[in-house]
């Protein structure tokens, strides 16, 4: 029985880090509008390009928050996620957040089976169970940690589902 459980774990474990790219095969673009207090303040676009087993997901985001007419928070960012089959193999982003430059350069190390990250807030390795925190990928809701798409920092998270849509 123990051998069966270990074998089952080894078969299922690699599937934790995959993005299920097939779920997005029919999409070439996802557009999200960003609202604050009912007012449109920006956008978040995802573009999907496929070539064989490779998928490139490009992300563009821009928004600004104003308070009493003054800009108090502003983000403009561009990022690229590259997948081979369902495995994220690289992620790169450049962001201007409140006039500060931030970045992430992530590579999948196939030898160690970890992500190597050079970012404006984090340099090091992390588990492939961590998900880049871009909202097109539903796996973000199942992960115990996410990689900031702006700075590369690792953020622990707990997601609690409060009910099913009826």
Named regions from a protein language model:
Residues 17-78, 93-100, 152-165:
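N-terminal cleavable signal peptides for secretion/export
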